[in-house]
Amino acid sequence: MRKHTDKPQLASKLVLRRVAIDTYRENVAYLHRDCAVYRAEGFQALSKVEVRANGRHILATLNVVDDPNIVACNELGLSEDAFAQMAVIDGQPASVSQAEPPQSIGALRRKLAGERLGREDFLGIVRDIAELHYSKIELSAFVVATNRDELDREEVYFLTEAMVASGRTLNWHEPLVVDKHCIGGIPGNRSSMLVVPIVAAHGLLCPKTSSRAITSPAGTADTMEVLAKVELPVDQLADIVRTHRGCLAWGGAAHLSPADDVLISVERPLAIDSPGQMVASILSKKIAAGSTHLVLDIPIGPSAKVRSMPEAQRLRRLFEYVAGRMHLSLDVVVTDGRQPIGNGIGPVLEARDVMRVLENDPRAPNDLRQKSLRLAGRLIEFDPDVRGGDGFAIARDILDSGRALAKMNAIIAAQGAKPFDHNHPQLGALTFDICASESGVVTGIDNLQVARIARLAGAPKVIGAGIDLFHKLGEAVTSGEVLYRVHAGFQSDLDFARQACAKSTGYTLGRAEDVPHVFTEF
């Protein structure tokens, strides 16, 4: 069988054309239906092809077009990602040929049949995924197979190990490198932007790399980008971390566990987040980033990812097993996931909340402050010079004294500060209010629905869009009182958000005794 690195046996010459289509982490090639090469090679739509140009080669999924304005008969089109990988210019000579299936396709088929896979199987699959040898169809098959027949804990370990091996691993040359991560699903919840400066001010090394939002109204990187640059070269990032003991940056530039980013591109549209994939995704990123100690936040709530304590404990045990095998010290904390954390949902609104907490502003959301202090305290207790149970008080002193604010300002300046005034944030100018339909107590806030409304309003693409919450669980409201305000930058976004609110505001009103009980470990 010919390998992907071998020279094609039959190559057909064309000229390259950049096709301005974002195919989201999938290499796509385009041929005109009347192209002589298309007919001679026996290509079909969705065929796997190998493209060579400029001394480089990629595998791509073939799309067939009928419009010569997109691709002419003598041209080979490449999607944005594919074109960038080839590092070429329009008009460059190129060859295209039938590609052999990825070498790991046999292991994928065995997983689809329900078989248990070993270490070498996962290494092969993840290598092919990271090198973009899998089409979206093959990626979806892998994600569905590992979700339908849940991976056993040994398979999760093998998958995590393979994902770490698929990219680079950072080494900070220190015995204690800490990080904090939440499994997600809770709007707001920008605790990382408070934990990092608190922990760094204590002296612990905390290189925080985060993702952008995919289906949520904002990720940590989106919110931090309101305050500073987050897309930084790895060398610059390392200098910032060594100087300031921490950073808050986008992790995409670091090439850490690249297979995870590819898998996410199909997991999110399918709404699949199986325990095994979740554990492998989170732990591979942290280990690749050089972390030695991790605090993991698992929120529980009626509309959170985890909805019961038994489910949380099962997930905890899986995380602990894999972390132990990977020599990562792990502290799992179960937290309140019944509602959003903080008052703002959307990049600017969340940045406002963070800066208010750092500045000890009386308007700061107390739930965000308290959660961040407790998580920071758990990280500080990794310090061998700190007695167990003292972390919270140390974190609180760092925040109250202004040391956390000073550290955050130093990190912002080092990454490249952007103008931001949390007293007068630039919010979307178009607004509407959602008011209580009756008097009562807020007994439920649907995390999924309020996140959906904020996203329809334009977040995170429109950084000033989102939702400003005025009331939280357990608070009494009167009929007509504003529950939250929706901000948008464009009328169409405002209309979409209004339509979603008409179906469900995400709020439930009732009696005080109807507020759901919370199980936490704080």
Swiss-Prot record:
The record's listing under SMART domains reads: PYNP_C (SM00941)
Look up keyword Transferase and say if it applies: yes
Q: Which reaction does it catalyse?
A: thymidine + phosphate = 2-deoxy-alpha-D-ribose 1-phosphate + thymine
Q: Which residues form a coiled coil?
A: none
Give yes or no: UniProt keyword Ligase.
no
Q: What is its EC number?
A: 2.4.2.4
One matching Pfam family, short form?
PYNP_C
* EC primary class: transferase
The organism's superkingdom is given as Bacteria
- Quote a single Gene Ontology cellular component term: cytosol
Q: Return one Gene Ontology term, BP aspect.
A: pyrimidine nucleoside metabolic process
GO molecular-function terms, A-Z: 1,4-alpha-oligoglucan phosphorylase activity; thymidine phosphorylase activity
Keywords, in A-Z order = Glycosyltransferase, Transferase
Similarity comment text for this entry: Belongs to the thymidine/pyrimidine-nucleoside phosphorylase family. Type 2 subfamily.
Query: HAMAP family, per this entry?
Result: Thymid_phosp_2
NCBIfam families per the UniProt record, alphabetical:
ARCH_P_rylase, PRK04350.1
Spell out the protein name for this chain. Putative thymidine phosphorylase
Q: What is the lineage of its organism?
A: Bacteria, Pseudomonadati, Pseudomonadota, Betaproteobacteria, Burkholderiales
